Swiss-Prot record:
Annotated consequence of substituting residue 87 to V: In HGLY and IG; no effect on localization to the plasma membrane; decreased amino acid:proton symporter activity; no effect on protein reaction kinetics; decreased affinity for proline; 3-fold increase of Km value for proline; decreased affinity for glycine; 5-fold increase of Km for glycine
Protein name as it appears in the record: Proton-coupled amino acid transporter 2
Record field: transmembrane: 59-79, 82-102, 149-169, 198-218, 223-243, 265-285, 297-317, 350-370, 380-400, 405-425, 438-458
Extracellular membrane side: 80-81, 170-197, 244-264, 318-349, 401-404, 459-483
Highest rank taxon of the organism: Eukaryota
Molecular function terms, GO-annotated: amino acid transmembrane transporter activity; amino acid:proton symporter activity; glycine transmembrane transporter activity; L-alanine transmembrane transporter activity; L-proline transmembrane transporter activity; proline:proton symporter activity
The organism of origin for this protein: Homo sapiens
PANTHER family according to UniProt: AMINO ACID TRANSPORTER (PTHR22950), PROTON-COUPLED AMINO ACID TRANSPORTER 2 (PTHR22950:SF185)
Lipid bilayer topology: Multi-pass membrane protein
Cell location: Cell membrane; Endoplasmic reticulum membrane; Recycling endosome membrane
GO biological process, one term: proline transport
Main function: Electrogenic proton/amino acid symporter with a high selectivity for the small side chains amino acids glycine, alanine and proline, where both L- and D-enantiomers are transported. Extension of the backbone length, as in beta-alanine and 4-aminobutanoate or methylation of the amino group, as in sarcosine and N,N-dimethylglycine, are also tolerated but decrease transport efficiency. A free carboxyl group is preferred.
Length: 483
């Protein structure tokens, strides 16, 4: 089963309705397992060229869009944790490695599609067939666990995104509401204002829960693309306004450390990996292209654009605000109506994007669950699982209300596995029997070791910071936590 973020356009979308009485979309997929591939034949996809599909430009836009979320707003704080020189350089290196690992995944998937005469292969299937191709008998016998491991990390990653979104929504809405009485029309000075205390940020998280429940009950991916389009527009406008502001009156950079303490670097690593975690969208995009032979070039171009945007936003944001930078750069904007509207636009965009991120774990878990019950219980079970999952993300966000640490934790735990650890190992298992140079094996081992070290150290550091903050401020709001 292909599981990914939406890459379809809104064409042909019907009126928005919950459609709770029809069978779940996942149930229909179980009844017709070949429906995913529409009318394509294996011979058509073997040539990597289709009569229908997205163009090169559309694939580029979708790839860039898949990397734009809350992660980019947290990168200035990440650079603070690494240093004004070390941070951008590390982002450049990590962007190159992440792009290389995406190329590895595409190369391995194309090899198995050609070898097995299949039209499409998702991340989990590619890893499973990679283990089957390995000469080790034990790995061959347990190859199906490769797909399960990928599915597990995809679930953790996407639900982690959802938790980050809830914390982001609460932090930004809380700041807007508290500053509403002192908001001015003067956008040229970022004066310190006395905020009017309101309810705890955790209550803001709960206030979003009914809207999130309604969104996740929309099970038609084509309808969700409407929300995707609205989210893209609102976030694009917000990013343009933010970049316009931070490029004004940049202070002297010499006051900032070139290299920060090594103790905070793991937090940078987790946040950076979180931002580059779009490897799950790569194979579905490649499959949807009219001519997939162009995809490697599109992947390189798209990730170059994304890396440049990340470095620019991260460096300029840290230069502009220095040690006062917060977990999301939107929280540093002046207290005028223009920049308050930026927060509201981003809130609307993230709220719409939540359903698309939620779609991925839902389409992994729900088909597995409803395949074990009768047809009459398929719909109630589908809706119940969605309700439990969205409540779980809200509960986790309430338990861990620090936006910067949630981002770093999600990136360290699951982002490193999907983006850095698994792809190099997959290349070894796929091509080892065909002969690989020692240099390639060394390169793959080095990347996987780097990912594993980042996984262990980044997770430990994020949890340690979280426990320290809870001990110091057990009942504080999340905005108080932001340094």
């Amino acid at each position: 089963m292909s599981v990914t973020k939406s890459t379809e356009g809104p064409q042909g979308a019907v009126a928005i309705k919950l459609d709770l009485m029809s069978p779940p979309e996942s149930a229909k997929k179980l009844e017709n397992k070949d429906s995913t591939f529409l009318d394509e034949s294996p011979s058509e996809s073997a040539g990597l060229k289709k009569t229908k599909g997205i163009t090169v430009f559309q694939a580029l836009i979708h790839l860039v869009k898949g990397n734009m979320g809350t992660g980019i707003l947290g990168l200035p704080l990440a650079v603070k944790n690494a240093g004004i020189l070390m941070g951008p350089l590390s982002l450049l290196v990590m962007g190159f490695i992440a792009c290389h690992c995406m190329h590895i995944l595409v190369k391995c998937a194309q090899r198995f599609c050609k070898r097995l005469n299949k039209p499409f292969m998702d991340y989990g299937d590619t890893v499973m067939h990679g283990l089957e191709a390995n000469p080790n008998a034990w790995l061959q016998n347990h190859a199906h666990w490769g797909r399960h491991i990928v599915s597990f990390f995809l679930i953790i990653t996407q639900l982690g995104f959802c938790c980050v979104y809830i914390v982001f929504l609460a932090d930004n809405l809380k700041q807007v509401v508290e500053a509403v009485n002192s908001t001015t029309n003067n956008c040229y000075s970022n004066e310190t204002v006395i905020l009017t205390p309101t309810m705890d940020s955790r209550l803001y998280m709960l206030s979003f829960l009914p809207f999130l429940v309604l969104l996740v009950l929309i099970r038609n991916l084509r309808i969700l693309t409407i929300f995707s389009m609205l989210a893209n527009i609102s976030m694009l406008v917000s990013l343009v306004i933010i970049i316009q502001y931070i490029t004004q009156e940049i202070p002297d950079p010499s006051r900032l450390p070139l290299v920060a303490s090594w103790k905070t670097y793991p937090l940078f690593f987790g946040t950076a990996i979180f931002s580059f975690e779009s490897i799950g969208v790569v194979l579905p995009l490649e499959n949807k292209m009219k001519n997939a032979r162009h995809f490697p070039a599109i992947l390189s171009l798209g990730m170059s654009i994304v890396t440049s945007l990340y470095i620019g936003m991260a460096a300029l944001g840290y230069l502009r605000f220095g040690d006062d930078i917060k977990a999301s750069i939107s929280l540093n904007l002046p207290n005028c109506w223009l920049y308050q509207s930026v927060k509201l636009l981003y809130i609307a965009g993230i709220l719409c994007t939540y359903a698309l991120q939620f779609y991925v774990p839902a389409e992994i878990i729900i088909p597995f669950a409803i395949s074990r019950v009768s047809t009459r219980w398929a719909l109630p079970l589908d809706l119940s699982i969605r309700l439990v999952m969205v409540c779980l993300t809200c509960l986790l966000a309430i338990l861990i209300p620090r936006l910067d640490l949630v981002i770093s934790l999600v990136g360290s735990v699951s982002g490193t596995a999907l983006a850095l650890i698994i792809p190099p190992l997959l290349e070894v298992t796929t091509f080892y029997s065909e002969g690989m140079s020692p240099l390639t094996i060394f390169k793959d081992a080095l990347i996987s070791i780097l990912g594993f070290v980042g996984f262990v150290v980044g997770t430990y550091q994020a949890l340690d910071e979280l426990l320290k903050s809870e001990d110091s401020h057990p009942f504080s709001n999340s905005t108080t936590f932001v340094r």
